[in-house]
């Protein structure tokens, strides 16, 4: 592909026009203790302290960066693009953290250019150099940002020679098309943020319940998130082949929830990101809908109960010692009126009797104070750690059939997973009300509209869309992955407060190519995901700062004009991205899953075009037409 220069000049550093500054960053606990501190690292002058904090605290590689580097010699790779390794020729190399944003921009753009060159994506070496420079310029000027796993993982091997033993990943070799087990943890990075994984109703075999926790851990370790539709798991009322009843959906969801809570995505960066989806006809759907509501009620009980118990038990202790009676009489309610009064007050507030008696015996032994932990409602507190359901986004998958049953106040059958028999019949409206109440009470579960989602599915011949990633912007086949990038709309606004469409289209084209290259270079946590990601090559290009963009134009966010702006920008981005995809296909060939789905792919494209032009009819294969803008 030919790459034009819009922001940079050939044979000149893309940083030439950018001023840099030295800043510091730290994280301090409420008690004043220091969690993190990095001084005198380099960022572009226009960067805010928040942006600097995020880069240093989250995205800088914290260890293993050599103080001196040398280029390797790789066949058919230009010397300027060759991977680097530690230069220990004089025995004085040391290892530390990244300390400059330029290091990060260089390793990201360099790795993408390197793999793009290996994949034959550039028409010439000059095009590769233009790509390398344009990407670094856009990163430094906050015009575009990739998803977090790219910042965490991409380029560590290419830029610094960082490596480690394989973690059980797989990839498809772009030259041979052969599914291959990774021999390294970083030579091929894990750049994808969003995964959708399947689960079978099987306890210990590949693809089953326990195997999913291993696959999830492999993703969380490198900073990615995952979603799964758990509706294949049988309900608690269903039998087992060996006799007895199943533990049910919820018992296994609690295991996965606890496992996710124990893992920080990216090792030191954030907690695991996880989506749990359950179909609206699952036998255990009612318990699932109420899960977080019930758990948050437990938190309220823990917080309130701990404070009530602490207050009354300390009062009982004080009554035992602030006593004018003699000896043992102080510990007998009949002879110590103050103690009797405190015991009655504690019982009225449901303080457990065994705790009341325990404190009296404790005081009798000569102790004059107790420690009884109290808790608060901070989301990261011990109270929330104690309960389940706090480490995932939960969503209910609803069909048009269910929504019509709600509207018509009909019955709704909950279906057993093993034999498809009816487990229970409920009123659809009552179930819908439970969803609404739970979402109001604790913001979960969300709703995924199964019928509409699959009406816009570009590859339905390959299977239904059954779930999404944790944030729900990625919806596709099970066992696939998507890597994301977002364009900062404010940086594409011209002096007339309008979108500079030429620069925007240029950026969309380049970043579509980056995401395509990322599929080629990536490794994946399972054979199935590696295979299907290679065959379908999904990518997720979007934009950020829409609110700031509209505010700068003086357009209300929730207005017809605001929505029309959003629709137009989205249509332009989508169109250019698909056009770039077609350009890549003309040189590299279409993705392997295209031929089977070409009819539906083009149908969805025609529907996108109709929506872009505000059509109200002529749509193909839709149950509900989109709202025109």
Features from the language model and the residues they span:
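Extended catalytic cores of very large enzyme megasubunits
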Residues: 1-629
């Amino acid at each position: 592909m030919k790459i034009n220069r819009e922001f940079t000049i050939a044979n000149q550093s893309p940083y030439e026009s950018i001023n840099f500054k030295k800043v510091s960053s730290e994280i301090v606990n409420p008690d004043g203790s220091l969690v993190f501190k990095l001084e005198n690292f380099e960022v572009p002058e226009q960067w805010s302290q928040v942006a600097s904090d995020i880069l240093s605290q989250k995205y800088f590689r914290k260890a293993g960066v050599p103080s001196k580097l040398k280029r390797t010699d790789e066949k058919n790779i230009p010397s300027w693009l060759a991977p680097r390794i530690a230069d220990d020729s004089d025995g004085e190399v040391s290892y530390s953290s990244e300390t400059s944003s330029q290091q990060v921009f260089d390793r990201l753009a360099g790795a993408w250019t390197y793999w793009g060159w290996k994949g034959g994506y550039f028409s010439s070496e000059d095009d590769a150099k233009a790509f390398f420079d344009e990407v670094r310029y856009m990163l430094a000027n906050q015009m575009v940002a990739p998803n977090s796993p790219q910042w965490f993982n991409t380029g560590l091997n290419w830029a610094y020679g960082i490596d480690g033993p394989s973690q059980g990943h797989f990839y498809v070799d772009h030259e041979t098309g052969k599914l291959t087990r990774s021999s390294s943890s970083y030579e091929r990075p894990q750049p994808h943020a969003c995964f959708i994984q399947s689960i079978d109703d099987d306890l210990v075999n590949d693809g089953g319940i326990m195997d999913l926790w291993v696959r999830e851990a492999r993703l969380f370790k490198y900073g990615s998130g995952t979603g799964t539709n758990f509706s294949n798991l049988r309900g608690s009322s269903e039998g087992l082949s060996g006799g007895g009843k199943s533990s049910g959906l919820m018992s296994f969801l609690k295991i996965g929830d606890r496992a996710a809570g124990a893992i920080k995505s990216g090792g030191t960066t954030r907690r695991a990101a996880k989506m749990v989806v359950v179909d609206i006809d699952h036998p255990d759907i009612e318990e699932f809908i109420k899960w977080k509501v019930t758990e948050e009620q437990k938190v309220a009980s823990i917080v309130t109960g701990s404070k009530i118990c602490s207050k009354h038990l300390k009062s009982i202790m004080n009554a035992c010692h602030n006593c004018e009676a003699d000896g043992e009489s102080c510990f007998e309610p009949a002879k110590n009126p103050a103690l009797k009064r405190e015991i009655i007050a504690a019982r009225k507030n449901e303080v457990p009797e065994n705790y009341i008696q325990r404190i009296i015996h404790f005081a009798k032994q000569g102790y004059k104070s107790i420690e009884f932990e109290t808790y608060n409602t901070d989301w990261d507190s011990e109270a929330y750690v104690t309960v389940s359901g706090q480490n995932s986004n939960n969503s209910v998958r609803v069909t048009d059939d269910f929504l019509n049953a709600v509207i018509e106040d009909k019955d709704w059958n909950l279906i057993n997973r093993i034999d498809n028999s009816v487990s229970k019949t409920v009123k659809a409206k009552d179930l819908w009300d439970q969803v609404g109440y739970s979402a109001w009470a604790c913001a979960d579960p969300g709703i995924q509209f199964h019928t509409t989602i699959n009406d816009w599915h570009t590859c339905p011949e390959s299977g239904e869309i059954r779930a999404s990633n944790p944030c729900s912007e990625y919806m596709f086949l099970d066992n696939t992955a998507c890597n994301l990038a977002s364009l900062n709309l404010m940086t594409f606004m011209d002096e007339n407060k309008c979108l500079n469409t030429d620069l925007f289209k240029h950026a969309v084209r380049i970043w579509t190519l980056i995401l395509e290259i990322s599929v080629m270079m990536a490794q994946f946590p399972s054979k199935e995901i590696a295979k299907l990601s290679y065959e379908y090559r999904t990518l997720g290009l979007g934009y950020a700062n829409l609110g700031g963009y509209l505010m700068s134009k003086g357009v209300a966010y929730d207005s017809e004009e605001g929505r029309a702006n959003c629709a137009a920008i989205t249509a332009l981005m989508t169109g250019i991205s698909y056009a770039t995809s077609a350009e890549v296909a003309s040189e590299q060939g279409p993705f392997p899953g295209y031929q089977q789905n070409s009819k539906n792919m083009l149908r969805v494209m025609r529907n996108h075009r109709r929506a872009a032009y505000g059509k109200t009819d002529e749509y193909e294969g839709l149950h509900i037409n989109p709202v025109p803008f």
